């Protein structure tokens, strides 16, 4: 679907001793079934933009639409439910629960939505097997490699069949070959007609996206790849 996610005149400022405007009148439309890379130096607004799209934070000014429906940032509970069902989030530091196994980390994300433990366990096990972790189901995060941990994080992000996947430096701490595998797992999500947006400093992976978006001076400059 074209223009599934629409950002219009988005600005975001943070109040410090001096007001800092990170995003400046940013507008862009994203389509499903595509993967977009965000590039830019540290402080260019990549993570801030992902936080706005994920509804973790709100813009100072501007409008965000999903499927032509505007987000009301005063409806926190409704937005939390929308995010849990429709947006999968992956971080460089994968934020896995340290006292839970790989299987538990994934199935708990679905249990909060489905309220069906057996169904959640089955979905989680199937996803982990698909990403090559059938022999790591009962391993804790401390027992997993960086690449294995990110595979768990990706499985957790997609278990609720989200329409959008957001990834903030998902390959940043991985060696090149492992990072390639993780990128391919993300790229394959296009086949499920999902919208994938990932922030990266790595030009190689940025160029593999359908669209490369440079974050410059708080706005987006599209670059065709």
Spans of model-derived segments:
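Catalytic Walker B motif of ABC-type/P-loop ATPase nucleotide-binding domains
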Residues: 165-168
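Helix-to-loop junction immediately C-terminal to a conserved catalytic motif
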Residues: 54
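Conserved ABC transporter NBD signature motif
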Residues: 62-73
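Conserved ABC ATPase signature
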Residues: 140-150
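Short coil-to-helix segment of the ABC ATPase nucleotide-binding domain corresponding to the Q-loop/switch region
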Residues: 100-109
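The feature captures the beta-strand-to-loop junction immediately N-terminal to the Walker
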Residues: 39-41
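A short, proline-enriched helix->beta-strand linker immediately N-terminal to the Walker B motif
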Residues: 159-163
